[in-house]
Amino acid sequence: MDELAHQVARFLEFLATQRSASPHTIAAYRNDLNGFSSFVRSERGNTVSTKTVDHLLLRLYLASLNGGLDKQQRAGYAKSSIGRKLAAVRAFFGWLVRTRQLEVNPAELIATPKREQRLPFHLNIDQTVTLIEAPGHTGQEQPTFARDTAILELLYSSGLRVSELTGLAVADLDRAAGMVRVQGKGGKERIVPVGSAALEALEQYLAGRGQLADDAPLFLGCRGARINRRTVAQLVKRWASGIPAFRSISPHTLRHTFATHMLEGGADLRSIQELLGHSSLSTTQKYTHVGLDRLLEVYDKAHPRARETDQQNGESA
């Protein structure tokens, strides 16, 4: 193992032990830093050190992510992927500087490409109801149908990340209070309300599981173990196939739908930020949006001059 690989391993250990990063986050960092390390070795040889990485090498790395200097090479990564990979490299060298193993972060001045501001897809209310009620409209009864309904209800009711949902234990759900305790990113705990429809679905699902220990997983996979992210994604995609004008829908779609419907219902951004577990309000601002028609409706109802103009027009007609 060369010095670069050794330091990458130490950085990943730091993320796990000191920052309480999730396994998913650590895996993403590992993948991005291993890709960077492979590029460095291809340019500087198999035995490389963090001290051999300079601004020029990082510029070459950025060019490779964009598809290479040769225009005949493959198409590059999306801007969002390039930004994530550069952020991983910048964080890695920043850690080396903070731990006094390097004097300067060579990635600090590498500009991150601006991401396209695409609005995430969300469901309207009718589509949401169609999705959530789909398992109950099959005309069949299977144990997984009650589980799937409970999962769909909870994702939409509380805006959970899929990793938060799969990590839930029975004791995390307070059915009497209508609350659920969630372990979010970085091990941060928050308490989130659970709506009555979701509670009812959870009651029906748990009633079929008998006596449960507090530390038992709240949701099980088909083999009786804790449900995983992939299974949740598959069941969401399966039941979403019945939605008119179907498109790719993931568990995260329900999280965004939750935030959008909360905002449209009058919730303020700070409250939505707390419910989603965002550390920064700017993340919530990017995450939520209101359609133009909804904005115009709110404006017409709320702005004094808008109402006054309508009244004047009505009187003159």
Curated annotation (Swiss-Prot):
One of its GO terms (biological process) is chromosome segregation. It is found in: Cytoplasm. Gene3D superfamilies: 1.10.150.130, Intergrase catalytic core. One of its GO terms (molecular function) is tyrosine-based site-specific recombinase activity. Transmembrane segments: none annotated. InterPro entries: CB (IPR044068), DNA_brk_join_enz (IPR011010), Integrase-like_cat_sf (IPR013762), Integrase_catalytic (IPR002104), Integrase_recombinase_N (IPR010998), Integrase_SAM-like_N (IPR004107), Tyrosine_recombinase_XerC/XerD (IPR023009), Tyrosine_recombinase_XerCD (IPR050090). Keywords: Cell cycle, Cell division, Chromosome partition, Cytoplasm, DNA integration, DNA recombination, DNA-binding. NCBIfam families: PRK00283.1. Forms a cyclic heterotetrameric complex composed of two molecules of XerC and two molecules of XerD. This is Tyrosine recombinase XerC. It comes from Trichlorobacter lovleyi (strain ATCC BAA-1151 / DSM 17278 / SZ) (Geobacter lovleyi). The lineage of its organism: Bacteria, Pseudomonadati, Thermodesulfobacteriota, Desulfuromonadia, Geobacterales.
